[in-house]
């Protein structure tokens, strides 16, 4: 058992919750995991009181697949690295850097694996992908898919086919040959998988 007071979970937004916590005189050190802008704000507040701060910022968790990879193992690892939590985790591998010599074979197998996913009620044992947390996030995902298609990005699996009226459901969505400079590469917390190639 954890003794009382050792672990306290306080939820809220940065300006209403995080800032008062960092400013509190009983807080002697700060650890922050999140976006770069949030980290800058936390560091600024902590520095005003000369509190040490440790940060893990940004990134969007790229996964890298080399030409000598076991394709089946890599496909399963990549799929399980993003889709089960709907990409709604800071450790979701939402970017895939894949060697150009294996991208076609890899993508074909990844699409097959993703098509076997069961999107639905997370309380059902057969479900492998639950809903998006809220409407704003759900609509952002749909907008990103629409925008990417209009810009001509190669959509190889469209998760919008899983959309329904009784919740914020969307299936795995995969874009292939996406440049690292596009907004899809760092897109936050979604079912979107953006494939980039390297040589």
How should these model regions be labeled?
Residues 25-27:
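Glycine-enriched alpha-helix->loop->beta-strand junction motifs that scaffold or abut catalytic
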Residues 1-18:
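PLP-dependent aminotransferase-like
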Residues 191-194, 198-199:
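Single conserved hydrophobic/aromatic residue that forms the stacking wall/gate
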Residues 19-23, 186:
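Short acidic alpha-helix that forms the nucleotide-activated donor recognition element
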Residues 13-20, 34-41:
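Beta-loop-alpha module in the N-terminal Rossmann-like domain of NAD(P)-dependent dehydrogenases
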Residues 29, 37-179, 187:
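ALDH superfamily catalytic-core signature
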Residues 183:
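Acyltransferase donor/substrate-recognition loop-hinge adjacent to the catalytic core
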């Amino acid at each position: 058992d954890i003794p009382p007071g050792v672990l306290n979970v306080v939820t809220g937004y940065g300006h209403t919750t995080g800032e008062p916590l960092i400013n509190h005189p009983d807080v002697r050190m700060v650890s922050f995991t999140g976006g770069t802008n949030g980290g800058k704000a936390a560091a600024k507040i902590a520095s005003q009181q000369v509190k040490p701060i440790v940060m893990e910022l940004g990134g969007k968790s790229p996964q890298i697949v080399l030409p000598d990879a076991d394709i089946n193992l890599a496909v399963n690892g990549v799929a399980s690295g993003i889709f089960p939590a709907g990409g709604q985790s800071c450790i979701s591998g939402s970017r895939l850097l894949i060697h150009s010599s294996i991208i076609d074979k890899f993508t074909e197998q990844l699409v097959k694996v993703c098509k076997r996913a069961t999107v639905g009620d997370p309380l059902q044992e057969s479900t492998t992908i639950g809903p998006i947390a809220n409407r704003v996030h759900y609509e952002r995902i749909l907008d990103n898919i629409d925008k990417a298609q209009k810009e001509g990005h190669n959509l190889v699996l469209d998760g919008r086919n899983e959309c329904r009226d009784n919740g914020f459901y969307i299936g795995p969505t995969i874009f292939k040959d996406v440049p690292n400079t596009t907004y899809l590469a760092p897109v936050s917390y979604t079912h979107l998988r953006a494939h980039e190639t390297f040589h």
